Amino acid sequence: MSHSASPKPATARRSEALTGEIRIPGDKSISHRSFMFGGLASGETRITGLLEGEDVINTGRAMQAMGAKIRKEGDVWIINGVGNGCLLQPEAALDFGNAGTGARLTMGLVGTYDMKTSFIGDASLSKRPMGRVLNPLREMGVQVEAADGDRMPLTLIGPKTANPITYRVPMASAQVKSAVLLAGLNTPGVTTVIEPVMTRDHTEKMLQGFGADLTVETDKDGVRHIRITGQGKLVGQTIDVPGDPSSTAFPLVAALLVEGSDVTIRNVLMNPTRTGLILTLQEMGADIEVLNARLAGGEDVADLRVRASKLKGVVVPPERAPSMIDEYPVLAIAASFAEGETVMDGLDELRVKESDRLAAVARGLEANGVDCTEGEMSLTVRGRPDGKGLGGGTVATHLDHRIAMSFLVMGLAAEKPVTVDDSNMIATSFPEFMDMMPGLGAKIELSIL
């Protein structure tokens, strides 16, 4: 599904205290995997709390195209899966729209099948490099026909029987790790992924939950060895998807920045590989209270009470990047209102997201009067605690949902309004954002440029 052709600019203005309780839409990583693993498992999978953004729905459609039966009854998604090893060759190309996660994970899932599968996406996704996922698949015997630079549109031609490999992930990427593990599901023998820096581990936890023969060992240097034995049986599960920490970041930072705010966010995923932003904000002096911490479906979940806070600049350790890679844009907004300097380093992954996210953030900050320096892999922001002189600019979002939401948050606390050139694509990850934020008291509206 492509975004509407005509852009919908939006403007955020300085707001009074934000107050209330909200429940964030389901986690995107877990939602993608729920559709995939449910579609692959034998028997019935029932999902509540699924993120119904376009990206996740595209993953569901891809699984339907390969034989899974998916329907919705009330609030519950019900999937009847095909059984591991029994995916069918899709009749047409699988269209992932803007969904990098869905596309890359599905490439792993189907690559080792003896069939031909084509992948297409929107203009933004078609610019993103897929080689990091395709290279290990090539080692397993998959043939690839791709556009220049291993980009989409592309076609995978699977081997008669795939070779199990041992693959050391060359960069901190949960998508690459996951793609290789999923390829291992349909491969005889043991497929091993060696991960020098731990990244989000939903694939491992959820595959174990669905019954895969998967083990994780961490050596004395913190290097993880993940082994999966292929061609085993997966069994349908019941899943309640917790709230997405990456989406939580926007109302959370807004509540910290808008004077007098007091907001409670319910049912947030607190998986330790995803909480880098909360940790960083707490180091900056944020008043974030973790309430009712609990385990749900093997994942850590809690409620967060967030109150307006005076923030101070910090140096964010580069090794924290994998646990908050999607949150740097909104952290840069928080840093714009913090006293002193905030240094963010190790941001090379941001160059290959929906946009060159690092450059997009730096340009947006500059357009709104923020003193910042963009390095090769770093961003330094010198803040203005009172928001004086900030705002007044229009931000080029480059079809990137996180850039759009981050700068709308900025406008809520800046002296002058902030406009983003398009808000259509917010629907890819957080369709409720434009209604939920005004419900707390945020002044955000669609604007006429």
UniProtKB/Swiss-Prot annotation:
The active site is at D326. It catalyses: 3-phosphoshikimate + phosphoenolpyruvate = 5-O-(1-carboxyvinyl)-3-phosphoshikimate + phosphate. GO terms for biological process: amino acid biosynthetic process; aromatic amino acid family biosynthetic process; chorismate biosynthetic process; response to herbicide. One of its GO terms (molecular function) is 3-phosphoshikimate 1-carboxyvinyltransferase activity. Phosphoenolpyruvate binds at K28, G100, R128, Q175, R357, R402. It is found in: Cytoplasm. Pathway: Metabolic intermediate biosynthesis; chorismate biosynthesis; chorismate from D-erythrose 4-phosphate and phosphoenolpyruvate: step 6/7. 3-phosphoshikimate binds at K28, S29, R33, S173, Q175, D326, K353. HAMAP family: EPSP_synth. Belongs to the EPSP synthase family. Catalyzes the transfer of the enolpyruvyl moiety of phosphoenolpyruvate (PEP) to the 5-hydroxyl of shikimate-3-phosphate (S3P) to produce enolpyruvyl shikimate-3-phosphate and inorganic phosphate. Resistant to the antibiotic glyphosate. This is 3-phosphoshikimate 1-carboxyvinyltransferase. The gene is aroA.
